[in-house]
Amino acid sequence: MSKARLRKGRALTGVVLLNKPQGMSSNHALQRVKRLYNAQKAGHTGALDPLATGILPVCLGEATKFSQYLLDADKAYRVEATLGVRTTTSDAEGEVVEEKPVAVDTAKVADAIKQFIGEQDQSPSIYSALKHEGRPLYYYARQGIEVPKKTRTITVHSIELLNIQDNKVTLQVSCSKGTYIRTLVDDLGQLLGCGAHVSMLHRNAVADIAEAAMVTLEQLETLAEEGYEGLDALLHPADLLLGQLPEVTVTQAQTRDFLHGQPIPLPEQNGNDAEEWRVATENSLFLGVARVKNAELWPRRVIAREHVDL
């Protein structure tokens, strides 16, 4: 096998549900998975802070075309907040900027977290990956450069108080895309009057994907020593990313048209008026995503024909 072909990698498609280790950037974790699988192409569905652990769906090959659907999905986190200390980054990796005595109890915390449930405008931390004039905000923060603060509308669906011990509060948070848990914890600390920062963060759900299916880098590395068979067995199909979309089944003739970018008639769907559909063959082979227009399914994102085994 030529060196050029080795560099090109394998043309495989699927999703790895990685449990990102603490202290590693999401991009570093992504590159580790890509190398282990020797994949041609890889991407993830939304970064986690280096401090955080938990579900990081890594998309390989054609699955990268559908990563946006999980970027836009709801997320769930288990977070530990340390009360009494604020930091520059609102987590344990930042410098301490304020310390105050903690005089709260379970009832006070339970009442405070209710204030953050629902739709609200949130100002992300200046130590975030959001862009300003093409650079992430953390670039300006590290240079000591002030930039205009922008708010974004987010929704916190629920917050459950799991535990309080000394100055540590553990919460389970379900929220919309774009929610910064560090900012939420900092705001909670301000409301309690003592300050707070994130000391542990674990993402335990993305859309309807739960943490039970996660694998670690150590598990992947062990399997890689034996070849690709064990690794490939852990791949989930690309349509795992599309659980929120209804599915429509198409015939063999319609499959050919769809893969060539042609619209196909929208079958009767018992009143379902969804604008986007997950398209599959009669044998449950995933083909892509279609958008409805004039009672037809128009291909929006399609698995490349060479990756479809008809």
UniProtKB/Swiss-Prot annotation:
GO biological process: mRNA pseudouridine synthesis; tRNA pseudouridine synthesis
Record-listed E.C. numbers: 5.4.99.25
Residues annotated as catalytic: 49
Alphabetized GO MF terms: RNA binding; tRNA pseudouridine(55) synthase activity
Alphabetical UniProt keywords: Isomerase, tRNA processing
Matches recorded under InterPro entries: PsdUridine_synth_cat_dom_sf (IPR020103), PsdUridine_synth_N (IPR002501), PUA-like_sf (IPR015947), PUA_sf (IPR036974), tRNA_psdUridine_synth_TruB (IPR014780), tRNA_sdUridine_synth_fam1_C (IPR015240), TruB_C (IPR032819)
Reaction equation(s) it catalyzes: uridine(55) in tRNA = pseudouridine(55) in tRNA
A Pfam short name: TruB-C_2
Top class in the EC scheme: isomerase
Role according to the record: Responsible for synthesis of pseudouridine from uracil-55 in the psi GC loop of transfer RNAs.
Family per similarity comment: Belongs to the pseudouridine synthase TruB family. Type 1 subfamily.
Protein name: tRNA pseudouridine synthase B
Species, as recorded: Idiomarina loihiensis (strain ATCC BAA-735 / DSM 15497 / L2-TR)
